[in-house]
Protein backbone atom coordinates (compact mmCIF):
# COMPACT_ATOMS: atom_id res chain seq x y z
CA UNK A 1 0.00 0.00 0.00
CA UNK A 2 1.31 3.44 -0.94
CA UNK A 3 2.06 5.82 1.89
CA UNK A 4 -0.94 7.96 2.75
CA UNK A 5 -0.73 11.32 4.47
CA UNK A 6 -2.11 12.11 7.90
CA UNK A 7 -4.82 14.22 6.27
CA UNK A 8 -5.88 11.30 4.09
CA UNK A 9 -5.95 9.00 7.12
CA UNK A 10 -8.20 11.47 8.92
CA UNK A 11 -10.40 11.75 5.83
CA UNK A 12 -10.83 7.98 5.77
CA UNK A 13 -11.64 8.03 9.50
CA UNK A 14 -14.35 10.67 8.98
CA UNK A 15 -15.87 8.81 6.04
CA UNK A 16 -16.00 5.49 7.93
CA UNK A 17 -17.53 7.07 11.04
CA UNK A 18 -20.08 9.09 9.05
CA UNK A 19 -21.11 6.08 6.98
CA UNK A 20 -21.39 3.88 10.09
CA UNK A 21 -23.61 6.50 11.75
CA UNK A 22 -25.84 7.37 8.78
CA UNK A 23 -25.60 4.51 6.24
CA UNK A 24 -25.42 7.23 3.57
CA UNK A 25 -22.55 7.40 1.06
CA UNK A 26 -20.23 10.27 1.94
CA UNK A 27 -19.44 13.00 -0.59
CA UNK A 28 -16.93 15.84 -0.49
CA UNK A 29 -19.64 18.33 0.48
CA UNK A 30 -20.49 16.39 3.66
CA UNK A 31 -16.80 16.04 4.54
CA UNK A 32 -16.19 19.78 4.23
CA UNK A 33 -19.36 20.83 6.07
CA UNK A 34 -18.98 18.41 8.99
CA UNK A 35 -15.31 17.55 9.36
CA UNK A 36 -12.81 19.50 7.24
CA UNK A 37 -14.10 23.06 6.76
CA UNK A 38 -10.62 24.44 6.14
CA UNK A 39 -9.79 22.05 3.28
CA UNK A 40 -10.77 22.93 -0.29
CA UNK A 41 -13.33 20.85 -2.16
CA UNK A 42 -10.78 20.01 -4.85
CA UNK A 43 -8.30 18.68 -2.28
CA UNK A 44 -10.97 16.55 -0.59
CA UNK A 45 -12.09 15.13 -3.94
CA UNK A 46 -8.49 14.34 -4.92
CA UNK A 47 -7.83 12.65 -1.58
CA UNK A 48 -11.03 10.62 -1.89
CA UNK A 49 -10.01 9.54 -5.40
CA UNK A 50 -6.57 8.55 -4.04
CA UNK A 51 -8.13 6.48 -1.22
CA UNK A 52 -10.39 4.84 -3.77
CA UNK A 53 -7.38 4.01 -5.95
CA UNK A 54 -5.76 2.34 -2.92
CA UNK A 55 -8.89 0.22 -2.47
CA UNK A 56 -9.86 1.82 0.86
CA UNK A 57 -12.99 3.50 -0.53
CA UNK A 58 -15.56 2.45 -3.11
CA UNK A 59 -17.88 4.51 -5.27
CA UNK A 60 -21.57 4.11 -4.56
CA UNK A 61 -23.54 3.39 -7.73
CA UNK A 62 -26.58 5.41 -6.69
CA UNK A 63 -24.76 8.61 -5.67
CA UNK A 64 -21.52 10.49 -6.09
CA UNK A 65 -20.46 9.63 -2.54
CA UNK A 66 -18.02 6.99 -1.37
CA UNK A 67 -18.35 4.15 1.09
CA UNK A 68 -15.60 2.23 2.90
CA UNK A 69 -14.39 -1.02 1.35
CA UNK A 70 -13.51 -4.03 3.49
CA UNK A 71 -9.87 -2.91 3.27
CA UNK A 72 -10.95 0.55 4.43
CA UNK A 73 -12.77 -0.89 7.44
CA UNK A 74 -9.73 -3.00 8.28
CA UNK A 75 -7.46 0.05 8.12
CA UNK A 76 -9.87 1.99 10.33
CA UNK A 77 -10.24 -0.84 12.85
CA UNK A 78 -6.48 -1.28 13.14
CA UNK A 79 -5.55 2.41 13.32
CA UNK A 80 -8.47 4.28 14.85
CA UNK A 81 -10.89 2.09 16.79
CA UNK A 82 -10.17 1.99 20.51
CA UNK A 83 -12.51 0.15 22.91
CA UNK A 84 -15.02 2.70 24.13
CA UNK A 85 -18.61 2.80 25.45
CA UNK A 86 -20.37 6.14 25.85
CA UNK A 87 -23.65 4.61 27.07
CA UNK A 88 -23.51 4.95 30.86
CA UNK A 89 -26.95 3.34 31.32
CA UNK A 90 -25.79 0.25 29.46
CA UNK A 91 -22.64 0.02 31.59
CA UNK A 92 -24.75 0.39 34.75
CA UNK A 93 -27.05 -2.45 33.66
CA UNK A 94 -24.08 -4.72 33.06
CA UNK A 95 -22.43 -3.78 36.36
CA UNK A 96 -25.65 -4.56 38.22
CA UNK A 97 -25.76 -8.01 36.65
CA UNK A 98 -22.17 -8.77 37.66
CA UNK A 99 -22.85 -7.44 41.17
CA UNK A 100 -25.76 -9.86 41.72
CA UNK A 101 -24.19 -12.67 43.75
CA UNK A 102 -27.43 -14.64 43.85
CA UNK A 103 -26.74 -15.73 40.26
CA UNK A 104 -24.15 -18.23 39.06
CA UNK A 105 -21.41 -17.02 36.74
CA UNK A 106 -23.07 -18.87 33.83
CA UNK A 107 -26.32 -16.98 34.41
CA UNK A 108 -24.42 -13.69 34.80
CA UNK A 109 -22.76 -14.18 31.41
CA UNK A 110 -26.07 -15.21 29.79
CA UNK A 111 -27.81 -12.10 31.14
CA UNK A 112 -24.95 -9.88 29.99
CA UNK A 113 -25.18 -11.35 26.49
CA UNK A 114 -28.93 -10.68 26.40
CA UNK A 115 -28.45 -7.05 27.48
CA UNK A 116 -25.76 -6.41 24.86
CA UNK A 117 -27.72 -8.12 22.11
CA UNK A 118 -30.86 -6.12 22.92
CA UNK A 119 -28.88 -2.88 23.01
CA UNK A 120 -26.93 -3.39 19.77
CA UNK A 121 -29.56 -5.40 17.85
CA UNK A 122 -26.76 -7.80 16.95
CA UNK A 123 -26.49 -11.54 17.58
CA UNK A 124 -24.35 -12.49 20.57
CA UNK A 125 -23.01 -16.02 20.87
CA UNK A 126 -21.75 -17.67 24.03
CA UNK A 127 -19.56 -20.69 23.34
CA UNK A 128 -18.48 -22.95 26.18
CA UNK A 129 -15.61 -25.28 25.43
CA UNK A 130 -14.18 -27.94 27.69
CA UNK A 131 -10.51 -27.58 26.81
CA UNK A 132 -9.43 -30.55 28.92
CA UNK A 133 -10.47 -33.11 26.30
CA UNK A 134 -7.27 -34.84 25.19
CA UNK A 135 -6.44 -36.96 22.17
CA UNK A 136 -5.80 -40.54 23.37
CA UNK A 137 -5.41 -42.56 20.18
CA UNK A 138 -5.91 -42.62 16.42
CA UNK A 139 -6.39 -45.95 14.63
CA UNK A 140 -7.11 -46.98 11.07
CA UNK A 141 -9.03 -49.96 9.71
CA UNK A 142 -8.67 -50.80 6.02
CA UNK A 143 -12.05 -51.30 4.34
CA UNK A 144 -10.78 -51.90 0.79
CA UNK A 145 -8.04 -50.61 -1.52
CA UNK A 146 -9.79 -47.26 -1.93
CA UNK A 147 -11.11 -46.54 1.56
CA UNK A 148 -10.24 -46.78 5.23
CA UNK A 149 -11.92 -45.96 8.53
CA UNK A 150 -10.13 -43.55 10.87
CA UNK A 151 -11.00 -44.00 14.54
CA UNK A 152 -10.22 -41.19 17.00
CA UNK A 153 -10.48 -41.74 20.76
CA UNK A 154 -10.47 -38.87 23.29
CA UNK A 155 -10.07 -38.65 27.06
CA UNK A 156 -13.79 -38.09 27.63
CA UNK A 157 -14.52 -41.55 26.24
CA UNK A 158 -15.71 -40.26 22.90
CA UNK A 159 -14.98 -42.49 19.92
CA UNK A 160 -15.30 -40.95 16.46
CA UNK A 161 -15.32 -43.00 13.26
CA UNK A 162 -14.88 -41.49 9.81
CA UNK A 163 -14.23 -43.00 6.40
CA UNK A 164 -11.56 -41.63 4.07
CA UNK A 165 -11.84 -42.35 0.34
CA UNK A 166 -8.90 -42.25 -2.05
CA UNK A 167 -8.11 -43.29 -5.63
CA UNK A 168 -4.63 -44.71 -5.19
CA UNK A 169 -4.14 -47.61 -2.77
CA UNK A 170 -0.58 -46.39 -2.10
CA UNK A 171 -2.17 -43.61 -0.04
CA UNK A 172 -3.21 -46.28 2.48
CA UNK A 173 0.44 -46.69 3.45
CA UNK A 174 0.82 -42.91 3.74
CA UNK A 175 -2.18 -42.71 6.07
CA UNK A 176 -0.76 -45.48 8.23
CA UNK A 177 2.61 -43.70 8.52
CA UNK A 178 0.95 -40.39 9.34
CA UNK A 179 -1.23 -41.97 12.04
CA UNK A 180 1.84 -43.61 13.57
CA UNK A 181 3.56 -40.19 13.74
CA UNK A 182 0.45 -38.69 15.34
CA UNK A 183 0.27 -41.46 17.93
CA UNK A 184 3.95 -40.94 18.75
CA UNK A 185 3.70 -37.15 19.12
CA UNK A 186 0.11 -36.09 19.82
CA UNK A 187 -1.15 -38.44 22.51
CA UNK A 188 -2.49 -36.49 25.53
CA UNK A 189 -2.44 -33.28 23.50
CA UNK A 190 -5.49 -31.04 24.16
CA UNK A 191 -7.83 -31.07 21.17
CA UNK A 192 -7.66 -27.27 20.91
CA UNK A 193 -3.88 -27.47 20.33
CA UNK A 194 -3.95 -30.17 17.66
CA UNK A 195 -3.89 -27.76 14.70
CA UNK A 196 -0.86 -25.86 16.03
CA UNK A 197 1.01 -29.07 16.88
CA UNK A 198 0.38 -30.58 13.45
CA UNK A 199 1.48 -27.37 11.77
CA UNK A 200 4.84 -27.62 13.54
CA UNK A 201 5.18 -31.27 12.42
CA UNK A 202 4.63 -30.69 8.70
CA UNK A 203 8.32 -30.96 7.75
CA UNK A 204 8.63 -34.33 9.53
CA UNK A 205 5.47 -35.66 7.88
CA UNK A 206 6.54 -34.39 4.45
CA UNK A 207 9.77 -36.42 4.66
CA UNK A 208 7.95 -39.68 5.34
CA UNK A 209 4.63 -39.33 3.51
CA UNK A 210 4.47 -39.05 -0.30
CA UNK A 211 0.94 -37.63 -0.63
CA UNK A 212 1.31 -35.68 2.56
CA UNK A 213 -0.98 -32.74 1.64
CA UNK A 214 -3.96 -34.99 0.88
CA UNK A 215 -3.36 -37.27 3.85
CA UNK A 216 -2.77 -34.41 6.28
CA UNK A 217 -5.88 -32.55 5.17
CA UNK A 218 -8.06 -35.66 5.44
CA UNK A 219 -6.78 -36.54 8.91
CA UNK A 220 -7.01 -32.97 10.21
CA UNK A 221 -10.62 -32.81 9.06
CA UNK A 222 -11.36 -36.05 10.92
CA UNK A 223 -9.68 -34.82 14.10
CA UNK A 224 -11.49 -31.48 13.88
CA UNK A 225 -14.81 -33.33 13.79
CA UNK A 226 -14.21 -34.02 17.48
CA UNK A 227 -16.20 -31.48 19.42
CA UNK A 228 -14.61 -30.87 22.78
CA UNK A 229 -17.84 -30.40 24.67
CA UNK A 230 -18.73 -27.24 22.71
CA UNK A 231 -22.01 -25.73 23.89
CA UNK A 232 -23.30 -22.77 21.89
CA UNK A 233 -26.02 -20.33 22.98
CA UNK A 234 -27.24 -17.66 20.55
CA UNK A 235 -28.94 -14.44 21.65
CA UNK A 236 -30.60 -11.88 19.40
CA UNK A 237 -31.60 -13.92 16.36
CA UNK A 238 -34.98 -12.18 16.37
CA UNK A 239 -33.24 -8.79 15.97
CA UNK A 240 -31.45 -9.69 12.74
CA UNK A 241 -33.99 -7.96 10.51
CA UNK A 242 -33.35 -4.70 12.38
CA UNK A 243 -29.90 -4.63 10.73
CA UNK A 244 -30.27 -3.14 7.21
CA UNK A 245 -27.37 -5.19 5.82
CA UNK A 246 -29.02 -8.43 6.99
CA UNK A 247 -32.43 -7.76 5.43
CA UNK A 248 -31.41 -9.27 2.09
CA UNK A 249 -32.85 -12.79 1.95
CA UNK A 250 -29.60 -14.48 0.91
CA UNK A 251 -27.51 -12.58 3.47
CA UNK A 252 -30.03 -13.39 6.22
CA UNK A 253 -29.88 -17.06 5.27
CA UNK A 254 -26.07 -16.91 5.39
CA UNK A 255 -26.11 -15.33 8.86
CA UNK A 256 -28.53 -17.95 10.18
CA UNK A 257 -26.31 -20.71 8.79
CA UNK A 258 -23.29 -19.12 10.48
CA UNK A 259 -25.10 -19.04 13.82
CA UNK A 260 -25.90 -22.75 13.47
CA UNK A 261 -22.41 -23.66 12.29
CA UNK A 262 -19.61 -25.09 14.39
CA UNK A 263 -16.68 -24.99 11.96
CA UNK A 264 -16.71 -21.19 11.69
CA UNK A 265 -16.18 -20.82 15.44
CA UNK A 266 -13.30 -23.29 15.31
CA UNK A 267 -11.62 -21.22 12.58
CA UNK A 268 -12.06 -18.03 14.61
CA UNK A 269 -10.82 -19.70 17.81
CA UNK A 270 -7.75 -20.96 15.93
CA UNK A 271 -7.01 -17.43 14.71
CA UNK A 272 -7.39 -16.01 18.21
CA UNK A 273 -5.04 -18.65 19.63
CA UNK A 274 -2.46 -17.68 16.99
CA UNK A 275 -2.68 -13.93 17.67
CA UNK A 276 -2.97 -14.21 21.46
CA UNK A 277 -5.32 -11.22 21.42
CA UNK A 278 -7.80 -10.72 24.29
CA UNK A 279 -10.40 -9.07 22.07
CA UNK A 280 -10.13 -9.85 18.38
CA UNK A 281 -11.91 -8.57 15.29
CA UNK A 282 -12.11 -11.10 12.45
CA UNK A 283 -13.35 -9.86 9.09
CA UNK A 284 -15.61 -12.25 7.24
CA UNK A 285 -13.50 -12.36 4.08
CA UNK A 286 -10.83 -14.14 6.18
CA UNK A 287 -13.25 -17.02 6.84
CA UNK A 288 -15.18 -17.00 3.53
CA UNK A 289 -18.04 -14.71 4.60
CA UNK A 290 -18.01 -11.30 2.91
CA UNK A 291 -19.38 -8.12 4.53
CA UNK A 292 -19.53 -9.64 8.03
CA UNK A 293 -17.42 -9.02 11.13
CA UNK A 294 -16.87 -11.26 14.15
CA UNK A 295 -15.78 -9.65 17.43
CA UNK A 296 -14.74 -12.01 20.19
CA UNK A 297 -13.20 -12.30 23.62
CA UNK A 298 -12.43 -15.19 25.98
CA UNK A 299 -13.46 -15.71 29.60
CA UNK A 300 -11.54 -18.38 31.50
CA UNK A 301 -14.22 -19.63 33.88
CA UNK A 302 -11.93 -22.29 35.32
CA UNK A 303 -9.20 -24.65 34.15
CA UNK A 304 -11.72 -26.94 32.46
CA UNK A 305 -14.19 -24.44 31.07
CA UNK A 306 -13.27 -21.70 28.62
CA UNK A 307 -16.10 -19.46 27.43
CA UNK A 308 -15.90 -17.42 24.24
CA UNK A 309 -18.21 -14.47 23.57
CA UNK A 310 -18.72 -13.52 19.92
CA UNK A 311 -20.70 -10.71 18.32
CA UNK A 312 -21.71 -10.99 14.66
CA UNK A 313 -22.09 -7.69 12.82
CA UNK A 314 -22.05 -6.15 9.36
CA UNK A 315 -18.80 -4.41 8.40
CA UNK A 316 -20.70 -1.12 8.84
CA UNK A 317 -20.54 -1.22 12.62
CA UNK A 318 -19.22 0.91 15.49
CA UNK A 319 -15.95 -0.97 16.07
CA UNK A 320 -15.05 0.98 19.20
CA UNK A 321 -18.39 0.10 20.76
CA UNK A 322 -18.38 -3.64 20.06
CA UNK A 323 -14.77 -3.94 21.23
CA UNK A 324 -15.59 -1.80 24.25
CA UNK A 325 -18.57 -3.95 25.23
CA UNK A 326 -16.61 -7.19 25.04
CA UNK A 327 -13.69 -5.75 27.00
CA UNK A 328 -16.10 -4.31 29.57
CA UNK A 329 -17.60 -7.76 30.21
CA UNK A 330 -14.15 -9.34 30.35
CA UNK A 331 -12.91 -6.73 32.84
CA UNK A 332 -16.01 -7.01 35.06
CA UNK A 333 -15.67 -10.79 35.04
CA UNK A 334 -11.99 -10.68 35.95
CA UNK A 335 -12.56 -8.11 38.72
CA UNK A 336 -15.29 -9.99 40.52
CA UNK A 337 -15.50 -13.62 39.43
CA UNK A 338 -12.16 -14.98 38.28
UniProtKB/Swiss-Prot annotation:
UniProt cross-references to InterPro entries, sorted A to Z: GAF-like_dom_sf, HrcA, HrcA_C, WH-like_DNA-bd_sf, WH_DNA-bd_sf, WHTH_transcript_rep_HrcA_IDD
Keyword annotations: Repressor, Stress response, Transcription, Transcription regulation
GO terms assigned for molecular function: DNA binding
Gene Ontology process terms (BP): negative regulation of DNA-templated transcription
A Pfam family annotated for this UniProt entry: HrcA
Entry superkingdom: Bacteria
Transmembrane segment boundaries: none
Summary of the function given for this chain in its UniProt record: Negative regulator of class I heat shock genes (grpE-dnaK-dnaJ and groELS operons). Prevents heat-shock induction of these operons.
Similarity comment: family membership: Belongs to the HrcA family.
Identification of the protein by name: Heat-inducible transcription repressor HrcA
Taxonomy of the source species: Bacteria, Bacillati, Mycoplasmatota, Mycoplasmoidales, Mycoplasmoidaceae
Amino acid sequence: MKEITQRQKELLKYIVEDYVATANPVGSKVVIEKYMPNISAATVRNDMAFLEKLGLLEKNHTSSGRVPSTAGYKFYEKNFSKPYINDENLKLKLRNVFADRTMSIDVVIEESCKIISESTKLPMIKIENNTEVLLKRIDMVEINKQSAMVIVITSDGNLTKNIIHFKDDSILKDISICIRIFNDRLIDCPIKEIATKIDSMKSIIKEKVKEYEFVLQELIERIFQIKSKMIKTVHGQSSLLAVPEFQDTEKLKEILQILESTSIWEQIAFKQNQTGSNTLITFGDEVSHEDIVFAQTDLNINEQNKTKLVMVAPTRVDYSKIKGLLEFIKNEFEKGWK
